[in-house]
Curated annotation (Swiss-Prot):
Residues 124-383 are extracellular. It comes from Rattus norvegicus. It is found in: Membrane. A lipid is attached at residue 101 (S-palmitoyl cysteine). GO terms for biological process: actin cytoskeleton organization; gene expression; metanephric podocyte development. Pfam families: Band_7. This is Podocin. Plays a role in the regulation of glomerular permeability, acting probably as a linker between the plasma membrane and the cytoskeleton. CDD domains: SPFH_podocin. It comes from the Eukaryota.
């Protein structure tokens, strides 16, 4: 009996140990899965971060402005974008590094300057004015950083070359060029453009002939903008047109490191045939206005004369005063003229038959019977 009880207890103990071992294995497997899941989540986070950084690197760093869409000069957004673009490229310039041979040359030149220090320092320092900036090229490579100045700057005489850029306001006259208006008139326009160098590094590294580039750009921009305006608008709205041209130019020249301050239309030259036709039209309009004014004056004068005649007809004393005033004016204007005044009553008598003849209307009277010439004579019985 004891042996049977011991065997049964051993069996139950073995079963319990097996079940506990199985539970331990399951818990370890679950922990392992959790541990595996955690690195997977970390890997996903890392991959997401990498994709985000890649997208940030792939994102464009520059804003592109289409000049053809700049039509309304009152848009302030275009000017703001142009200002931002003009400040960005100077920081974004990345000059290429020097090679091994170039570094050896730089070190040797520095050693030579140090050895001959008291005398060489005068050849390595230059002065830049307040309105100037200096760009240094070392062995053909643009040195990193902003333009030097104002004040002193150091350079290597044998390896460096420097270029000075004037930041003061520049003036450029645009010669006469043909423009076709909206109403198909051909005219010649000249203008003047005021600009300044804003980014010296970008200017020297991107543009060769500043004046020619700005001149051609102003001409093409004016042709494009004035094609949407009539002749009358061009002659009357020069200020708004100049503002439109300035905004359009500034959106392009910001990439070159140039800031356009102002543009003005100086003169508009019309062809001879168009000038003659416009002069004839203007003269006809002036003649029409003169005729209208003369007709209105005659109408007002006739109305005033009619009113004066009505007033004088009601007051005989006023007629006499007018008669005396006329005599006095005749004597003063022409002293050699002798005037014999007649009494006013005689004038009334002389004028009354004429007034009656003019005022009376002779109506046709009824026909009277014709009497024979010899009424006493009788006709013969034969007749």
């Amino acid at each position: 009996m004891d042996s049977r009880a011991r065997s049964s207890s051993r069996k139950t103990h073995g079963r319990g140990s097996r079940s506990s071992s199985r539970d331990d294995k399951k818990s370890k497997a679950g922990r392992g899965n959790r541990g595996r899941a955690r690195p997977d989540a970390g890997a996903e986070r890392q991959s997401a971060g990498r994709t985000g950084t890649r997208e940030e690197h792939r994102a464009p760093a520059a804003t592109v402005v289409n000049v053809d869409e700049v039509r309304s000069p009152g848009e302030e957004g275009t000017e703001v974008v142009a200002l931002l673009e003009s400040e960005r490229p100077e920081e974004g310039i990345k000059p290429s590094g020097l090679g091994a041979c170039e570094w050896l040359l730089v070190l040797s030149s520095l050693i030579f300057i140090i050895v001959t220090f008291p005398f060489s320092i005068w050849f390595c320092i230059k002065v830049v004015q307040e309105y100037e900036r200096v760009i240094i090229f070392r062995l053909g490579h643009l040195l990193p950083g902003r333009a030097k100045g104002p004040g002193l700057f150091f350079f290597l005489p044998c390896l460096d070359t420097y270029h000075k850029v004037d930041l003061r306001l520049q003036t450029l006259e645009i010669p006469f060029h043909e423009v076709v208006t909206k109403d198909m008139f051909i005219m010649e326009i000249d203008a003047v453009c005021y600009y300044r160098m804003e980014n010296a590094s970008l200017l020297l590294s991107s543009l060769a002939h500043v004046s020619k580039a700005i001149q051609f750009l102003v001409q093409t921009t004016m042709k494009r903008l004035l094609a949407h305006r009539s002749l009358t608008e061009i002659l009357l709205e020069r200020k708004s047109i100049a503002q439109d041209v300035k905004v359009a130019l500034d959106s392009v020249t910001c990439v070159w490191g140039i800031k356009v301050e102002r543009t003005e239309i100086k003169d508009v030259r019309l062809p001879a045939g168009l000038q003659h036709s416009l002069a004839v039209e203007a003269e006809a309009q002036r003649q029409a206005k003169v005729r209208v004014i003369a007709a209105e004056g005659e109408k007002a004068a006739s109305e005033s004369l009619r009113m004066a005649a009505e007033i004088l007809s009601g007051t005989p004393a006023a007629v006499q005063l007018r008669y005396l005033h006329t005599l006095q004016s005749l004597s003063t204007d022409k002293p050699s003229t002798v005037v014999l005044p007649l009494p006013f009553d005689m004038l009334n008598l002389l004028s009354s038959p004429s007034n009656r003849a003019q005022g009376s209307i002779n109506y046709p009277s009824s026909p009277k019977p014709v009497e024979p010439l010899n009424p006493k004579r009788k006709d013969s019985p034969m007749l």
